[in-house]
Regions:
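Catalytic-core environment of secreted peptidases
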Residues: 40-42, 46-70, 151-172
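Protein/peptide-recognition domains central to ubiquitin and immune signaling
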Residues: 1-5, 79, 87, 91-109, ...
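Solvent-exposed loop/turn segments at secondary-structure junctions
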Residues: 33-34, 54-57, 95-99, 126-127, ...
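Long, well-ordered, tryptophan-enriched scaffold segments
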Residues: 84, 88, 108-157
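Noncatalytic luminal/extracellular "stalk/propeptide" segments of secretory-pathway proteins
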Residues: 1-60
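Extracellular/periplasmic catalytic domains that process cell-envelope and extracellular macromolecules
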Residues: 18-22, 40-44, 83-85, 113-114, ...
Length: 172
């Protein structure tokens, strides 16, 4: 088979994969309805890719925030929902409208009593490629993720007010 590198980044709060990584077949779904329709028999032991496309028409109509909200639900709740059906990891198509090979990440959630599985954001371009390949044949991926949560520490924000020479009384 062909080997293709995929651009992804761990979701905020994700657990790591085992040190040696994990390999699994990818199941591509658009939304929670498609995931649940596959049930445990279609999901158990697999890596789920939520390939929900950002709604550009909604964004162009002035509802970009709502379009983003529809996309990020899979980032936040995807791992816990897929884990309930036995998934071993979850990938989420980048939530924004950018069409590039940069993975857009954010926070994910876990639920009490549900097995924690690794979660990562995958770039728009790679999500499209995986979905296209999965229509023709099984796609397997090896994930090696090393995120960690460190103890809280005190931190600071630096804020400065610099007076300009042309309009010193205005804030830019």
């Amino acid at each position: 088979g062909t080997v293709q590198k995929v651009v992804l980044t761990a979701l905020g709060g994700s657990i790591a994969t085992p040190a040696e990584g994990m390999t699994g077949e990818i199941v591509v779904v658009k939304d929670f309805d498609e995931l649940n329709a596959l049930g445990r028999n279609g999901i158990e032991g697999k890596i789920v890719l939520f390939n929900h496309r950002f709604d550009r028409e909604m964004q162009a109509s002035g509802f970009g925030g709502a379009a983003y909200g529809l996309a990020v639900q899979y980032r936040f709740a995807g791992a816990m929902t897929a884990a309930r059906l036995g998934a071993i990891a979850v990938l989420v198509r980048s939530a924004g409208g950018s069409q590039n090979r940069l993975a857009h990440t954010g926070v994910m959630g876990y639920a009490d009593g549900v097995t924690k599985i690794p979660g990562a954001a995958v770039s728009y371009e790679d999500a499209e490629t995986i979905a296209w390949l999965a229509k023709a044949d099984k796609v397997r991926i090896k994930l090696t993720m090393t995120p960690q949560t460190l103890p809280d520490v005190e931190s600071y924000n630096v804020i400065a007010d610099l007076k300009g020479s042309d309009k010193p009384d205005e804030i830019v």
